[in-house]
Regions:
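Intracellular juxtamembrane helix-capping segments at the cytosolic ends
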Residues: 152-166
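Juxtamembrane intracellular "pre-TM" segments in multi-pass secondary transporters
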Residues: 17-54
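C-terminal membrane-cytosol helix-exit motif in multi-pass small-molecule transporters
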Residues: 3-21
Length: 177
């Protein structure tokens, strides 16, 4: 919570609120649902976006599984206390940020799809290796390697959506993202 609050400070201090549209909440909700239904209906016209959203659903589910069970696995398999699991998670976030920054030039040079493919493949290989190790320091080292690919997989996914979605529908498609 403290982490979130700290990094939200610039949002609260320097981002102005939008003016009230005057539209009643009930009308806004109805219009929003109508737009969502329309976006889903027309998604089939944009096959590349549809295929990407389906593929992303699968590999993001894998990432979410890592995030959800990684701490439990670390605690049970290596006897990590909650403070060490927290430090491991923070270190993973730092390496993910470094990986995202480091791979940004490859996203520009190769495009997002090869970066996503490389990242997801590396995450799978490193993740399997992490399940097999018995030494805590090796687990930590592999975890930091894993983090280097977690950031690019997520950043390149956003880049991919931004590139393949038609400009006029980009915000709607990011709503499905």
């Amino acid at each position: 919570g403290v982490w979130m609050a700290l990094f939200a400070i610039p949002l609260f201090l320097w981002t102005p609120d939008r003016q009230d549209t005057g539209i009643p909440a009930k009308t806004a909700i109805r219009e929003g649902i109508s737009t969502l239904i329309g976006t889903i209906r027309h998604l089939g016209q944009y096959r590349q976006v549809l295929r990407f959203l389906i593929a992303r659903m699968f590999y993001t589910d894998g990432l979410n599984t890592l995030f959800a069970f990684g701490g439990i696995f670390a605690a049970v398999s290596f006897g990590m206390e909650s403070d060490e699991v927290l430090m491991f998670g923070l270190a993973l976030n730092v390496t993910a940020g470094l990986g995202a920054a480091g791979f940004a030039f490859l996203d520009d040079k190769w495009g997002p799809k090869p970066v996503i493919t490389l990242s997801v493949g590396a995450i799978a290989v490193i993740g399997i290796a992490m399940l097999m190790v018995t030494d805590k320091s090796v687990f930590w080292a592999l975890g930091m390697g894993l983090g280097l690919f977690l950031g690019p997989s997520q950043a390149a996914s956003r880049s991919m959506m931004a590139r393949i979605a038609p400009a006029a529908l980009r915000t709607e498609f990011f709503g499905l993202y």
